[in-house]
Structure formats: structure tokens, C-alpha cells
Amino acid sequence: MNTLTFLLSTVIELYTMVLLLRIWMQWAHCDFYNPFSQFVVKVTQPIIGPLRRVIPAMGPIDSASLLVAYILSFIKAIVLFKVVTFLPIIWIAGLLILLKTIGLLIFWVLLVMAIMSWVSQGRSPIEYVLIQLADPLLRPIRRLLPAMGGIDFSPMILVLLLYVINMGVAEVLQATGNMLLPGLWMAL
């Protein structure tokens, strides 16, 4: 049963990350004709296409993709808790799972971008999209801390900021008195 839970949880998280990538790519105005962008659109289009006719976009945010990502996070919470209930704690857990997945996605994009910058040297279409994704997040840090000696420290600063936010959210959840949510947050 734990193997099935792990497998289902992983598949849900991966598809949620692809949905979040789609939202992020639209927000960052990534090159739509890039092969990686086309992959993300083709993987998500069967579910998002019909929903977009019913659910309009909220400015630069693709609300249909965000809704499906939240529903998948809610399903992941049910899978992790191994209980089918619609109590508010499960809805909150779904939101926390979605927020944690956003943080993990940012971390992985930064890590893969850094590794690819050492290996591919700008020839990969994936690297081009990752740079387009990370640039809006790194630009404010680069304004405060420009590259020193040709080394850009902004990705490391952003990863450190993600860790601080992660610990801060855990402390806030612990202060609520509910022991389930901080444990869930740290276990994800």
C-alpha cells in the first residue's frame, strides 16, 4: 500500500509541476515555439483545453491550470492522509501541498538551469526556457547584488530565500497549534 501511495503521490506531483510550469511560462512570456514549451502545452492541453472554455484567465494567470493544480494537490492530500473527507483541514493541506510544490519547482528550475549552464553552454532549448522562467525571479536580486567577477550569486540567494520561507511557514503552522499541518509541510 505504501508503494502505491508513493507512486500515486509522485505522479500527481509531477503533473502538478507541469501545470505550474505552464502557468509560469505564460506569466514569464516564454517562447511558445520552443520544443520544451510545446511539450508542456501538449501534455496539459487535453485537460486544460476544455476547461479554458468555461474558466476564464485571471490576467496573466491561467486560472484553469491553477484550479486543476489545486485539485490535484487536494487529491494528493487525500492520498497522503489515506482518508476521504471534505473537512477544512484537507482543503488547507491541499493548499499547503500546492505552495510547497511551487517552491520545489522554483528550486528544481534553478538547479537544472545552473547545471545546464556548466554543461550545454547555451545550446539547449530547455536551458533557454529555464532562463526565461528564472529571469523575472532573479532580476530583483541581481539589481541588489550584481555579478561579482563573472559569478552570478542570485540563484544561490533565491534558493537561500526559499529555505528561509520554508522554515518560516513551518514555524507559523506550528504556532497555530495544529500538529498535523507542520508535520505535513516538513514531510513534503
Swiss-Prot record:
Stated family:
Belongs to the YggT family.
User: What is the official name of this protein in its record?
Assistant: Uncharacterized protein YggT
Record localization: Cell membrane
Q: Cellular component terms, GO, for this chain's entry?
A: plasma membrane
Q: Name one GO biological process term.
A: cellular hyperosmotic response
Q: Which gene encodes it?
A: yggT
InterPro entries given in the database record: CCB3/YggT
Q: Which UniProt keywords apply?
A: Cell membrane, Membrane, Transmembrane, Transmembrane helix
Pfam families in the cross-refs: YGGT (PF02325)
Q: How does it sit in the membrane?
A: Multi-pass membrane protein
Q: Indicate whether Membrane appears among the record's keywords.
A: yes
List membrane-spanning regions. 1-21, 67-87, 89-109, 145-165, 168-188
